[in-house]
């Protein structure tokens, strides 16, 4: 394995990077709210109150109430659970499966690489949102199927990324030395190649999570993801679309939550890219 930058140097660089710090603080904040929603939420997110329908934001209900009198702040907090669960969970699956496929394809090459490359190209031909909608519609309604649809949509992104990085590493001296001493292909990939292609994977994970949150919200908005009365940012925006003139807070606050979460993961990814891959010059979109 090649000798890279000392770990303490990278840690210092991460700590000093304002994008990493800012993004990490926001990510921890959103995840903390999602995890502690049951404690932090001021009201039951699905409890209806016919006496308090469409109330404007006030000290009693900081984000107002919806058409059923449900507290929008509480629903936004619990909605973070659904959106972040699908966003993080789907990308975790996609990154794991895609990395394995990319390592196999890039290391062995030949017919295996050609076959796997063709499969990835087919998936990558379609826009992510359109493909996720099609897969989710085929699988059926529900948060689990939405998670699976996004995972299937994004694994080729990681597969192509890791394949390219692996092909760039496999001819280097440390890989050849491992082969000479009799290391198996599995050992070379696990102990030598994977650690050296991990940086771009980590960066891509943070960026992909932000995109997955948008797709999950879109699926829920269309009725394919999280099902009512379980709150989700996408379903909340959909429920408030007919009240944009009279009660805009129903849609505005979950929309702001989506924007904040997406920016948080993008900031974190941009900062990680600056530190782990300075040659990239930051995010390019």
Where are the model-predicted features located?
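A short, glycine- and basic residue-enriched loop/turn
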Residues: 70, 132, 172, 177-178, ...
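Generic hydrophobic transmembrane alpha-helix motif, especially the helices
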Residues: 62, 66, 96-168, 172, ...
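Residue-level signature of the transmembrane alpha-helical cores
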Residues: 23-26, 120, 149, 156, ...
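Gly/Trp-centered helix-boundary motif
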Residues: 1-99, 103-104, 110-114, 129, ...
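Glycine-rich helix-loop "coupling/hinge" segments at transmembrane-helix boundaries
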Residues: 124, 135-138, 150, 165-166, ...
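Alpha-helical transmembrane segments of multi-pass membrane proteins
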Residues: 30-34, 133-137, 150-156, 207, ...
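Short hydrophobic alpha-helical segments within the ABC transporter permease transmembrane module
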Residues: 72-77, 84, 119, 126, ...
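Amphipathic alpha-helical segments that mediate coupling or scaffolding at interfaces
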Residues: 13-14, 76-79, 83, 104, ...
């Amino acid at each position: 394995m090649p000798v890279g930058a000392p770990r303490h140097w990278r840690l210092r660089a991460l700590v000093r990077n304002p994008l990493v710090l800012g993004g990490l603080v926001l990510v921890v904040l959103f995840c903390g709210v999602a995890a502690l929603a049951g404690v932090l939420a001021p009201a039951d997110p699905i409890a209806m109150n016919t006496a308090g329908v469409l109330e404007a934001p006030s000290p009693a209900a900081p984000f107002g109430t919806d058409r059923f009198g449900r507290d929008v702040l509480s629903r936004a907090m619990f909605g973070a659970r659904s959106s972040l669960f699908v966003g993080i969970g789907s990308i975790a699956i996609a990154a794991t499966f895609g990395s394995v496929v990319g390592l196999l394809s890039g290391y062995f090459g030949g017919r295996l690489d050609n076959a796997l490359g063709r499969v990835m190209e087919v998936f990558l031909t379609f826009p992510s949102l359109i493909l996720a909608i099609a897969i989710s519609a085929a699988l059926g309604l529900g948060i689990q199927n939405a998670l699976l649809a996004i995972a299937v949509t994004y694994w080729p992104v990681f597969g192509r990324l890791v394949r390219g990085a692996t092909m760039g590493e496999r001819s280097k001296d440390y890989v050849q030395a491992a082969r000479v001493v009799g290391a198996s292909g599995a050992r070379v990939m696990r102990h030598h190649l994977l650690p050296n292609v991990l940086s771009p994977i980590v960066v891509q994970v943070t960026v992909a999570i932000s995109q997955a949150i948008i797709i999950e919200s879109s699926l829920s908005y269309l009725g394919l993801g999280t099902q009512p009365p379980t709150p989700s940012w996408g379903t909340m925006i959909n429920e408030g679309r007919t009240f944009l003139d009279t009660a805009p807070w129903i849609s505005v606050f979950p929309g702001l939550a989506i924007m904040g979460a997406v920016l948080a993961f993008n900031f974190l990814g941009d900062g990680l890219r600056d530190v782990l891959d300075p040659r990239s010059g930051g995010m390019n979109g």
